[in-house]
Amino acid sequence: MRILGIDPGLARVGYGVIDVEPRKGKQEGSQRMIDCGIIRTDPGRSEGERMVEIARDLRQIIRIHQPELASVEKFFFYRSSNTIAVVQARGVLIMTLARFGLPIVEFPPMQIKQALTGHGHADKDEVLEAVMRELNLDTPPRPDDAADALAVALTGWFQH
């Protein structure tokens, strides 16, 4: 199964693509990274134009990698001037995934941390170490948004 993980944002959307294969008779399986990176939007453009950039680039990623499941980080904001724009960008991401008919699972940050490290209060380094271990990577995936998206993809596999 191919899973696309997404770490939503307006300036940078992290994405990570993994392939997973269940092992017979075991709950866990093997997984490997196919691709990861970011969708970067131009801060000099209007929010609407940036949403178009996000949708366009995500469509291309979906067409190239043909995922069977999308796993998206679900986040909660308290007070931030950027909240509305990020929520709108997340809506564009969800809509684009739905247009491709992809099943979508969503996880809050604590659940992602729990799935990868065994506790919901892990720091970024602990999550990164878990991503590297699970995907058998020698070097950390960069940038951080891409590494976060791989964590989201792995959570989709572990929890789906």
Curated annotation (Swiss-Prot):
Keyword rRNA-binding: no
InterPro entries registered for this protein in UniProt: RNaseH-like_sf, RNaseH_sf, X-over_junc_endoDNase_Mg_BS, X-over_junc_endoDNase_RuvC
Entry's Gene Ontology molecular function annotations: crossover junction DNA endonuclease activity; DNA binding; magnesium ion binding
GO cellular-component term (any): cytoplasm
Listed Pfam families: RuvC
SUPFAM superfamilies assigned: Ribonuclease H-like
GO biological process, one term: DNA repair
Cellular localisation: Cytoplasm
Subunit text: Homodimer which binds Holliday junction (HJ) DNA. The HJ becomes 2-fold symmetrical on binding to RuvC with unstacked arms; it has a different conformation from HJ DNA in complex with RuvA. In the full resolvosome a probable DNA-RuvA(4)-RuvB(12)-RuvC(2) complex forms which resolves the HJ.
Entry's family note: Belongs to the RuvC family.
Stated role: The RuvA-RuvB-RuvC complex processes Holliday junction (HJ) DNA during genetic recombination and DNA repair. Endonuclease that resolves HJ intermediates. Cleaves cruciform DNA by making single-stranded nicks across the HJ at symmetrical positions within the homologous arms, yielding a 5'-phosphate and a 3'-hydroxyl group; requires a central core of homology in the junction. The consensus cleavage sequence is 5'-(A/T)TT(C/G)-3'. Cleavage occurs on the 3'-side of the TT dinucleotide at the point of strand exchange.
Name recorded for this polypeptide: Crossover junction endodeoxyribonuclease RuvC
Annotated organism of origin: Synechococcus sp. (strain CC9311)
